[in-house]
């Protein structure tokens, strides 16, 4: 019986110490024709959620420099989400309002 206790305790300890970091969701608010915060830093696997808090205006999130197509427009009280799997710096802007800019930085 004692021969089984130590291996079982060792396995339980190893399982308990190998926690996997849970992916996080970071919120960027769109209001008054601005992305707030304008710059965010996340880890690979994290999600950015853009929330449109305007009263009447639609927006989009476009990673044009990365060669992406423009995301669908989203209207007040709607959201757009994107998961970032690779490290790097990803500038973006609003398609209909190119003066609205932001940057997502992804690093370990």
Residue ranges and their predicted role:
Residues 1-7:
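Bacterial N-terminal signal peptides that target proteins for export
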Residues 7-16:
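Bacterial N-terminal signal peptides
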């Amino acid at each position: 019986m004692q021969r089984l206790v130590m291996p079982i305790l060792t396995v339980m300890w190893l399982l308990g110490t190998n926690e996997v970091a849970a992916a996080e969701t970071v919120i960027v608010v769109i209001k008054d024709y601005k992305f707030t915060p304008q710059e965010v830093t996340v880890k690979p696997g994290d999600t950015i959620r853009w929330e449109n808090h305007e009263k009447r205006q639609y927006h989009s999130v476009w990673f044009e420099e990365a060669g992406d197509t423009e995301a669908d427009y989203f209207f007040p009280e709607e959201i757009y989400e994107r998961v970032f799997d690779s490290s790097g710096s990803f500038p973006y802007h609003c398609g209909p309002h190119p003066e609205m800019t932001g940057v997502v930085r992804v690093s370990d």
